[in-house]
Amino acid sequence: MRAASTNKALLAAAASLAPAGMIIDPFDRLAEVPPFNPDHETPTPPAIVALWRGEIGISDGLLISTPEYARGVPGSLKNALDWLVSSEVFPGKPVALFQASERGGAVQAALRLILETMSAKLVEPAMLTLPLLGTQTDAVAIAANPAHSNKIREALEAYARFLA
């Protein structure tokens, strides 16, 4: 994820606003996940894939915040999701999608299709789109803006209720 990513800032703001007991721990190593290859689907996958699957396995849910590239899902995210397809840790996993731009409709639609195919539980009340593109890209500023922080809290509280 880019250092100045608005989606990264949104996740950091969400982490600071999360309800008691909710920990948001971004996985920032997607770029290290090798290209998916079914031939490498063995009991001992590459170490970073094992780490990724392990993090997903111990989590109660998955919160995805991603940009839209060429009207779709960024390759690194799609690749990481591909590594979860045959894994027992993902089916039924509750997923919320956060979007830092109102222009992210295509990535949302593509992600929904992918995640539904993977048997995720999409948590509709926890879905969030904020018009952050071209505004505050700093997590502190996002969290300090009542219009944004209230919406983030509402989405996270809905997610927490679903996970409870």
Enumerate the predicted regions with their spans:
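Helix-loop-strand module that forms the ligand-binding subsite of alpha/beta enzymes
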Residues: 44-119
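N-terminal beta-loop-helix "entrance" segment that forms/cooperates
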Residues: 29-45, 137-140
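A general structural signal for well-ordered alpha-helical segments in protein cores
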Residues: 7, 11, 49, 77, ...
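N-terminal beta1-alpha1 ligand-phosphate binding loop
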Residues: 1-22
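Short beta-strand elements in bilobed, periplasmic/extracellular small-molecule ligand-binding domains
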Residues: 22-31, 35, 122-131
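Active-site-adjacent alpha-helix of alpha/beta-hydrolase-fold enzymes
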Residues: 13-20, 114-122
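Glycine-rich phosphate/pyrophosphate-binding loop and the adjoining helix
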Residues: 121-164
